[in-house]
Amino acid sequence: MTPRPIRHQYEDLMRHVFEHGTAKGDRTGTGTKSVFGHQMRFDLSEGFPLVTTKKVHLKSIILELLWFLRGDSNVRWLQERGCTIWDEWARDDGSLGPVYGVQWRSWPTPDGGHIDQIQQVIDTLKTHPDSRRIIVSAWNVAELDRMALMPCHAFFQFYVAPSQVAGEPGKLSCQLYQRSADIFLGVPFNIASYALLTHMVAQQCDLQVGDFIWTGGDCHIYSNHFEQVRTQLARQPYAYPTLQIKRRPASIFDYAYEDFEVVGYEHHPAIKAPVAV
């Protein structure tokens, strides 16, 4: 068995922003070092891109993605499963307004209807895989003011590279545009979440996985994360683990937490840090 390569795109981004970022204010009043515009590419056939220089809480990543795919925008479902990552932004009744899941699954139309963007993606990949319009947007300008937190990971596109071998399935890649990227806390979640989504969509559409491309806008490290970043950058990364999906449900919306297993996740200890709200 060929050993998996050790990749460090994420750590390179962190180091670049930490060493060369511009001091910049922000909405939370915390202060940041920031760089505008960066891209990372992860070959999903090499392994599942779960950051190894600190332990990342995989359960929260999986549950949050399933919550998005439910079209849900109330934290109760997450809380019932022990996931509290959205609690800081929730209103008293648990609602967050029309955030990610609502836009993904039921984008409102002027005539009172709704568009299920995720179902459109699946349908188009199966019928027109060469389409350049296989896109999901969470950035609904008309509804931003009603959201507890405007979308940070705002827009993503799928792409199928046809196989050069007759009879083999094509390779599915996904590119995400993240307008606001909290490098220490948020970005490891976002990378793993969209890599997982790419695996799920590929399974549903009988495709192989290709690349996950992460494109960031305002890439920043909060000033109250500087010590944690120094700790993390002193560590050497390990090879990424692998992802196993244990069953193929009837649709993209029918996966359960128990369907996923990450194998061989070697990692350094977790590093705690405050969330900027």
Swiss-Prot record:
<dbReference type="InterPro" id="IPR020940">
    <property type="entry name" value="Thymidylate_synthase_AS"/>
</dbReference>
<protein>
    <recommendedName>
        <fullName>Thymidylate synthase</fullName>
        <ecNumber>2.1.1.45</ecNumber>
    </recommendedName>
</protein>
<dbReference type="GO" id="GO:0006231">
    <property type="term" value="P:dTMP biosynthetic process"/>
</dbReference>
<dbReference type="InterPro" id="IPR000398">
    <property type="entry name" value="Thymidylate_synthase"/>
</dbReference>
<feature type="binding site" description="in other chain">
    <location>
        <begin position="179"/>
        <end position="182"/>
    </location>
    <ligand>
        <name>dUMP</name>
    </ligand>
</feature>
<comment type="pathway">
    <text>Pyrimidine metabolism; dTTP biosynthesis.</text>
</comment>
<dbReference type="InterPro" id="IPR036926">
    <property type="entry name" value="Thymidate_synth/dCMP_Mease_sf"/>
</dbReference>
<comment type="function">
    <text>Catalyzes the reductive methylation of 2'-deoxyuridine-5'-monophosphate (dUMP) to 2'-deoxythymidine-5'-monophosphate (dTMP) while utilizing 5,10-methylenetetrahydrofolate (mTHF) as the methyl donor and reductant in the reaction, yielding dihydrofolate (DHF) as a by-product. This enzymatic reaction provides an intracellular de novo source of dTMP, an essential precursor for DNA biosynthesis.</text>
</comment>
<keyword id="KW-0963">Cytoplasm</keyword>
<comment type="subunit">
    <text>Homodimer.</text>
</comment>
<feature type="binding site">
    <location>
        <position position="182"/>
    </location>
    <ligand>
        <name>(6R)-5,10-methylene-5,6,7,8-tetrahydrofolate</name>
    </ligand>
</feature>
<dbReference type="GO" id="GO:0006235">
    <property type="term" value="P:dTTP biosynthetic process"/>
</dbReference>
<keyword id="KW-0808">Transferase</keyword>
<feature type="binding site">
    <location>
        <begin position="132"/>
        <end position="133"/>
    </location>
    <ligand>
        <name>dUMP</name>
    </ligand>
</feature>
<feature type="binding site">
    <location>
        <position position="276"/>
    </location>
    <ligand>
        <name>(6R)-5,10-methylene-5,6,7,8-tetrahydrofolate</name>
    </ligand>
</feature>
<feature type="binding site">
    <location>
        <position position="57"/>
    </location>
    <ligand>
        <name>(6R)-5,10-methylene-5,6,7,8-tetrahydrofolate</name>
    </ligand>
</feature>
<dbReference type="InterPro" id="IPR045097">
    <property type="entry name" value="Thymidate_synth/dCMP_Mease"/>
</dbReference>
<dbReference type="GO" id="GO:0004799">
    <property type="term" value="F:thymidylate synthase activity"/>
</dbReference>
<keyword id="KW-0489">Methyltransferase</keyword>
<feature type="binding site" description="in other chain">
    <location>
        <position position="190"/>
    </location>
    <ligand>
        <name>dUMP</name>
    </ligand>
</feature>
<dbReference type="InterPro" id="IPR023451">
    <property type="entry name" value="Thymidate_synth/dCMP_Mease_dom"/>
</dbReference>
<keyword id="KW-0545">Nucleotide biosynthesis</keyword>
<dbReference type="Pfam" id="PF00303">
    <property type="entry name" value="Thymidylat_synt"/>
</dbReference>
<feature type="active site" description="Nucleophile">
    <location>
        <position position="152"/>
    </location>
</feature>
<comment type="similarity">
    <text>Belongs to the thymidylate synthase family. Bacterial-type ThyA subfamily.</text>
</comment>
<dbReference type="GO" id="GO:0005829">
    <property type="term" value="C:cytosol"/>
</dbReference>
<feature type="binding site" description="in other chain">
    <location>
        <position position="27"/>
    </location>
    <ligand>
        <name>dUMP</name>
    </ligand>
</feature>
<dbReference type="GO" id="GO:0032259">
    <property type="term" value="P:methylation"/>
</dbReference>
<feature type="binding site" description="in other chain">
    <location>
        <begin position="220"/>
        <end position="222"/>
    </location>
    <ligand>
        <name>dUMP</name>
    </ligand>
</feature>
